[in-house]
């Protein structure tokens, strides 16, 4: 993969800036039906991937020439801004909370990212249709439960999506997530898996004998 470009990295880091960090948003958590009041600045700190990881995804997409990207879990659209800045021609990102999705849409409009589309609705309701994008890379960062991860993988298989790369964020989020990752690594269907700690990377049906790598990242 191309080397780390400090100038390019710093240019992309600007996406982490929240324009109105004290803006308060209110929404209902769709899973737990809990009313949430939080500032956009705090929400960004709570859910956003590290700059290092987002830049890694950007480089991965460019290096492997991926053109269609599907992200599960938009939040404020910070990570998707990195994806939208890559050479990918189409980026679809799914967000289940309408109030948050609207903020992401506003961000992409200001960036003039016409090739980035926010898919509103719970991911379990929108994932199947979104696979119609025929993504080269799928980034999963919406639901940190093993049952959700295996549901994503099952739907991908059922719909015979020829995705080249699946990235699962936060594989060390919990014992449950790590157990799921270990099960994926042991699955013969996934011939190439890579653990970079912040995420697990799967290359389904890669034409090699089964291999797994752990990379300090």
Describe each PLM feature range.
Residues 1-139, 143-165, 171-217:
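A short alpha-helical cap/connector motif
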């Amino acid at each position: 993969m191309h080397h780390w470009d400090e100038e390019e990295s710093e240019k992309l880091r600007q996406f982490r800036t929240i324009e109105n960090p004290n803006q308060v948003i209110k929404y209902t958590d769709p899973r737990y039906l809990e009313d949430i009041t939080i500032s956009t600045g705090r929400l960004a700190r709570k859910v956003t991937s590290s700059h290092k990881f987002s830049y890694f995804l950007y480089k991965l997409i460019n290096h492997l020439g991926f053109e269609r990207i599907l992200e599960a879990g938009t939040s404020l659209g910070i990570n998707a801004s990195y994806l939208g800045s890559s050479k990918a021609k189409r980026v679809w990102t799914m967000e289940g909370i309408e109030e948050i999705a609207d903020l992401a849409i506003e961000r992409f409009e200001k960036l003039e990212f016409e090739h980035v589309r926010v898919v509103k609705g719970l991911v379990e309701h929108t994932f199947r249709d979104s696979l119609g994008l025929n993504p080269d890379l799928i980034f999963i960062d919406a639901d940190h439960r093993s049952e959700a991860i295996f549901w994503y993988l099952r739907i991908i298989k059922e719909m015979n999506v020829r995705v080249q790369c699946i990235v699962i964020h936060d594989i060390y989020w919990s014992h449950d997530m790590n157990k799921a990752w270990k099960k994926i690594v042991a699955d013969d269907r996934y011939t190439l898996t890579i653990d970079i700690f912040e995420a697990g990377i799967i290359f389904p049906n890669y034409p090699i004998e089964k291999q797994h790598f752990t990379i300090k990242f």
